[in-house]
């Protein structure tokens, strides 16, 4: 019910502000445009399409070899065709279960796919991006262990490190970096020393930022022996052929899911994958979709365990995260379902083979040498005799990024 302000109410508020009228509160600026805007005449749809194509033709499409960030994978046409159907496409979180069964089922299927892929017990409905998912896992770890120290490998994606620093700037969380060995992997002796000083968790990234594969099982044993939690940050496509986080007993496993059926974009949405062991489910952030029965005994999907969340517990919530990337998660679900285990294995093998072929061909040239000797998946670091900036500029002229 809306009750409007009376004239007396308005007069009292204006007097408190120090003005006599509403017009005086919002004065129109004296400097106004005089004359017509210098704009071309309007175009019809056909003319506008031609003009936009002309502008877009100035872009130079490059063959993408750039590493250290988002990854470009082929997205089947069926992904977009299915994800834009009205039964699934949504602009917001489906609180009203009876009117949102399509969206809720899609989220449930996403969680099921991710749990199977990561070999983990629980997946939430997704976070905003991989960096957010990692920060939320760290936040949960500090609460679970009642310890404000988080260790992370120096080979963690630098953007993620910056997000962690921003997240915990005013939260008294102590972030400590673990150095690397000469082969580009985490120094386990240094890690053990830091763990013995006490820590809530260690962040392992494998493949790491430099493409190197870490000794996940050995690191997991070391972390757990020192009463800390293991947070694994992984490349989801690599799980088609590499060890899953569940297989080496990770407590939390997170990832950037952009490569699963989502196209590259500059500044647009990506997909934060977040998984954990079942005993931590009441300490994590984000939506959780569960399967239930309605009053007639029929299968139904609902948001569950909402007592963890901000709209219920307010300042006592596990986090202030109160939404998810439903469309990106839907794309990932359709992509994984279309490919299946064998299809994802093929994607992973192709990525592995292409990267190793590129390494071999590059290193035949005397101007290139592999920097790290550790095994790698689909990215690697090379050293060059010529300045890197000069090479990048020359490659762009030839059509390569």
Per-segment meaning from a language model:
Residues 1-34:
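Compact, charge-rich alpha-helical regulatory domains located at protein termini
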Residues 1-2, 132-298, 367, 381-385, ...:
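Conserved PLP-enzyme active-site core in the AAT-like
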Residues 29-109:
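N-terminal entrance/gating region of PLP-dependent enzymes' catalytic architecture
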Residues 86-97, 113-120, 145-146, 168-176, ...:
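Gly-rich Lys/Arg/Thr-decorated short loops/hinges at beta-loop-alpha junctions or inter-strand turns
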Residues 260-366, 370-373:
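Active-site C-terminal subdomain of aminotransferase-like
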Residues 36-38, 53, 57, 71-73, ...:
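Flexible, glycine-rich loop/tail regions that form catalytic "lids" or insertion modules at the edges
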